[in-house]
């Protein structure tokens, strides 16, 4: 029977059909090779947008710097970064006038956060530029290395464990004449193996001390490492993203804390909330504009796009904003917050690995590191690369490029949102002083603008005024990529609005399926994704039931765990059949052990082990939940785990799911090949650091309201916490006197060992 597809849509409102337009089925594109070319593009573009600015030279590092602030007023529609300081300050003043006390209150909240933030805040985050090794490392390791170097150079304020004290060390480190660091290196030598009598390569790992003078240290402290952004859909070209080092991160964190606090109080800001909360906030603004545009007014909405938002923003402008926002605050607070923008005004971008060359016959390959780009003969490069390198040469210092203007991706999302909202705020009638007025939504570089006016000319005039006002603060609305609709239909941050936000369920499609962590986690993540989509994305009961059946089928094929009574033959079917026959209560077997599926859309919130526990044979329970089972290396048992879920569009989301640890929660063993390289020392440091952090977390779980306060080392904090907890447990009768005495003895021993050390 042929089905006419148009019949499917007869009863469906147009906006619900959005899920059928899903374009992203395959894998997203990933980048290979070096990001050097993309980084050069970014640097060259950024300088081009600000080319009429003033050139100066940084006295400390010798880096040439371009300052476009208060540059020429725009005469055409080309994107430009010439923000006018007085315009930005005025926009801030009007924002404060419309929201009395907003800056004052946010400053107070931020001061409180600064007093309480621990340095371990910086261990969050993935790859971080590690200035001691001059390459990327996991955040925790990069922080540990930085602190280790600081301490060996006599900077010890960080020992209090407060982030603000670590930042004091950072500032002090910049005044030092030299910094001594330890680097890892690797020696190879050929030796004869005693057993086999063959020649083998023996590798030894050494550490050597290296002194960095003030200039080189400053360059490293101001360096952002660059990488290529992966998995970006809908783009022909890749682009570069930056990862800052530990010196900059803490300062950025405090600035963003202040900006986040301001954004929370602004109804036009799409940050820092997300999901349904964001939709509700945005729907309010739209409702306000539609209600106010009575029958006499027209209302249009622009789905906006800005040209190269980051590359036209300027850290000097952010400094002006912060100076204004904190103007009545204590000196120390203003200083702490102004350091991030000052560092960004003097930032250096690391060019990455450099270029790879292959000979015509493909026999020879050689890598030209970024450091060599200053001196190498350009005849080896093609036309476009040659142009790039020529442009960038005057800015090069030791493989890093001076990049004063521009912001790099994702650095000051909240603060730049405040700037955007301040322009939206100027659309009120009391500021436009005419018949048109505007409002809108802003989330980082994405915006939607709603303009109301009595007639079409008024709408046009309103849009023009908005466009010009943006230009004055370095925001370039793209006339080519923005489009206008009657209010009621627009798109903002991949949310589609049509008389209300439309659930675009197809965007979540890539996150359905089997994650491939292990049998236990995969089952849990799979059903949680379905549950979450029923809550958030209008996934209806019939579709959810179908999704569930498809998921179970997929899961069984992935882990070859078809039901014990099935006819399908796989490598596991012999064992699973045997288990099926021995089991009295077959409903109690987990799906991954060949059991039946007991999930339906009503019980998706219950972990499978809990769902089937009462139905299990006793000996099966004993095998399943046995921490001593020698075949399973267990994860730490946490009640909640986090999975990274990839929607089709936008950033990877973190999703919580229930984790019941069983013998199915195995972790694959780590690849051994890393152990023979110079990374080995780093890896061991990392594991030790990880263990310490885990231990510390056990003493001070993040849910605990008793955070370690005051100046003490991690060990002292843990010992004192152990003593307090032991006393409480002893007095309430949870532990015996002997146990209490033993704990106290261990604590004293630890303190004694520390003293001897």
Swiss-Prot record:
Phosphorylated by host PRKCA. PROSITE patterns: RDRP_SSRNA_NEG_SEG. It catalyses: RNA(n) + a ribonucleoside 5'-triphosphate = RNA(n+1) + diphosphate. One of its GO terms (cellular component) is host cell cytoplasm. GO terms for molecular function: nucleotide binding; RNA binding; RNA-directed RNA polymerase activity. Keywords: Eukaryotic host gene expression shutoff by virus, Eukaryotic host transcription shutoff by virus, Host cytoplasm, Host gene expression shutoff by virus, Host nucleus, Host-virus interaction, Inhibition of host RNA polymerase II by virus, Nucleotide-binding, Nucleotidyltransferase, Phosphoprotein, RNA-directed RNA polymerase, Transferase, Viral RNA replication, Viral transcription. The keyword Protein biosynthesis does not apply. InterPro entries: RNA-dir_pol_NSvirus (IPR007099), RNA_pol_PB1_influenza (IPR001407). Residues 55-64 have a biased composition (Polar residues). Residues 249-256 are annotated as: Promoter-binding site. Its EC number is 2.7.7.48. Gene3D superfamilies: 6.10.140.720. A motif (Nuclear localization signal) lies at residues 187-195, 203-216. Its main location: host cell. Residues 286-483 form the RdRp catalytic domain. It is found in: Host nucleus; Host cytoplasm. GO terms for biological process: DNA-templated transcription; symbiont-mediated suppression of host gene expression; symbiont-mediated suppression of host mRNA transcription via inhibition of RNA polymerase II activity; viral RNA genome replication; viral transcription. Residues 50-82 are annotated as: Disordered. Belongs to the influenza viruses polymerase PB1 family. Influenza RNA polymerase is composed of three subunits: PB1, PB2 and PA. Interacts (via N-terminus) with PA (via C-terminus). Interacts (via C-terminus) with PB2 (via N-terminus); this interaction is essential for transcription initiation. RNA-dependent RNA polymerase which is responsible for replication and transcription of virus RNA segments. The transcription of viral mRNAs occurs by a unique mechanism called cap-snatching. 5' methylated caps of cellular mRNAs are cleaved after 10-13 nucleotides by PA. In turn, these short capped RNAs are used as primers by PB1 for transcription of viral mRNAs. During virus replication, PB1 initiates RNA synthesis and copy vRNA into complementary RNA (cRNA) which in turn serves as a template for the production of more vRNAs. This is RNA-directed RNA polymerase catalytic subunit. It comes from Influenza A virus (strain A/Leningrad/134/1957 H2N2).
